[in-house]
Amino acid sequence: MALSLLLAVVCAKPLVSRAELRRIQALNPPWKAGMPKRFENVTEDEFRSMLIRPDRLRARSGSLPPISITEVQELVDPIPPQFDFRDEYPQCVKPALDQGSCGSCWAFSAIGVFGDRRCAMGIDKEAVSYSQQHLISCSLENFGCDGGDFQPTWSFLTFTGATTAECVKYVDYGHTVASPCPAVCDDGSPIQLYKAHGYGQVSKSVPAIMGMLVAGGPLQTMIVVYADLSYYESGVYKHTYGTINLGFHALEIVGYGTTDDGTDYWIIKNSWGPDWGENGYFRIVRGVNECRIEDEIYAVYLD
């Protein structure tokens, strides 16, 4: 009985607290930390369920040749010192969304990249919202609200395709188990699918990543998450506090730049809602593989 109560208390540990915030602020991080409304009633256990566990990531076989800087330079040369998808393609920008308690960051980031690159290439003349829910529920090589991985996700979008959010809206916000794969749109009409032409992994070269962003738009990446990220409000994030890896988190890289004091950064679109961070986005140090952000990055090819 005592052990059960102890486990319940551990699992109910709040993700954020003012005491922990003070400890972070005492370290004088190069970014602003605060109490995030998004996580004020979330436990650490619930937060972990929003992330991707290591056992949900497949062994990396190295079978997918990375896109090299030489290939990128054939697409864009010289590579500009800064790029922001929101400024370059304002007609394509959609608000940052909130995945809720479902561990579906893998789907939100992939669908974001898919739609943004379609718009950047002129396939869609304006921003179209594609369905995260269809991908979560129907990509059976992934784990629904319990995480997913890059290659099975992009394989699904290449061979099966994505439908629109108008057809299948997101319903797993408060779920930890994915809803069944729908046979028709929410209104009963047939599901129309839009396929990717293929996908590729970008090399770990920072210039190659920058060039691929400029050449075709946002890319998908993944980071290791530590406790301090949940407190992020603004600035260029650098891991400052917390030694425990809480899980992996898939994200959308939408640009890069350099601060006035010379700090290079990536611009990231998150899936924790528009009230977190910088209107749902955050910046993270570029060029030092901060939180493994430059380890594994994917681009989608479109007709």
UniProtKB/Swiss-Prot annotation:
InterPro entries: Papain-like_cys_pep_sf, Pept_asp_AS, Pept_cys_AS, Pept_his_AS, Peptidase_C1A, Peptidase_C1A_C
Stored Gene3D superfamilies: Cysteine proteinases (3.90.70.10)
Sites carrying sugar chains: N41
Signal sequence bounds: 1-19
UniProt keywords, alphabetically: Disulfide bond, Glycoprotein, Hydrolase, Protease, Signal, Thiol protease, Vacuole, Zymogen
MF term (GO), any: cysteine-type peptidase activity
GO cellular component: vacuole
GO biological process: proteolysis
Keyword Disulfide bond: yes
Induction field: Not expressed without supplemental iron.
CDD domains per the UniProt record, alphabetical: Peptidase_C1A_CathepsinB
Disulfide-bond pairs as recorded: C92-C119, C102-C145, C138-C181
Enzyme Commission number(s) from the entry: 3.4.22.-
Compartment annotation: Vacuole
Domain of life of the native organism: Eukaryota
Entry annotation: catalytic residues: C105, H249, N270
Family membership noted in the UniProt record: Belongs to the peptidase C1 family.
Protein name, as recorded: Cathepsin B-like CP1
Source organism: Giardia intestinalis
Gene that produces this protein: CP1
